[in-house]
């Protein structure tokens, strides 16, 4: 078995990506480039001569539109090459591997992808560096060395999960230092509670995995701890809206008395859910499905199916991906819609419609006006739109409402909201409690380095250096795999076997 490097470039009449990039660089960086070429690079491993020929002709290129070569003349040319960071999910490479395996029967084939950018009309080294800074987002990619020997090293040394010896005896000062050293999102009070539990109940020190899981699922991203902040001493400033705000607040206080007799603390979460709880108490939400599964809002509806009325479940879910989209727009926006789909999908429903609402600052401002430590607003706006569109197109989901709001406040952080609706026949769903001996299935794509710590990363305060230090906290979307799960769950024989199902997102640990 051998290894090969294949270069694939669009013929001039089809080189829309290269022409678009040339226009983009000239307009936004005030350059005078005369031409740009973009060449996809495939490093293919563990194949023989016949298999690489099959891959070149049938997988890596299209005969009508592409030029394929095993070498690339870069003599005297100004260029740079890029590739994904090690461990990042590379959908182009993954798709190539699957196709080559299907065509050749070779299960050992491996592929890495990259891209070469050739620039004509560069006046200085300063311009090259300017282009690299604009094009390369260090969160997801790096420069590729075309002179380095081909290598594909998937070997990972699996170490024993460490136990934090002495943890249950740490002082408050040591616990606080521990939080900072391990980059955790939880508070000192959180970790003190964990320490007390392990000291009194488990009578042992915790492992790294146990603390990481708790840090993830206790994070603001997962548990919305910000909305549980206690609200005290509420007053309203005098002004145009004083009376209506005061009246609304008093109505809320009366609802609290009617619903739970003020036994629960006043929080933003209580404000957000109190109306629904009152409606349910009054018997106005009898169509709401209530279960132990916390996936998506689910209500019972009657559906006319070929003239006969059938009970179905209609599910709604929305998700924000503000932080991920701010630092890696394409991946953040694509996994926003992907994550929103995953929740009603976990409820066994088929998601058939979506909407996207986003918020950005002035997308017309120049690159030079970009705040330090942030991506240009136009980059965030364009690439996030591409990410949402890419994921939706691949999974086959129509997005029937799209709106981007522009306000200077979104310069602090981009807003990315995805919302979906799905449905499933009620008789194809069962909600039961798991029991000892039940089979547990973990279903989905392979986990890469991307996305690890995503939930806790979204829950921490961010600084000017966040874009350099959060390199693994934005997951790469894998729409084809989620589409396979969607198709599997459309089979009632499958869903009727499932007692309980929950989305296992938030990036992993």
Which residues does each PLM region occupy?
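Core nucleic-acid recognition elements
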Residues: 1-462, 467-481, 488-496
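Functional cores that coordinate and move charged inorganic groups
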Residues: 486-509
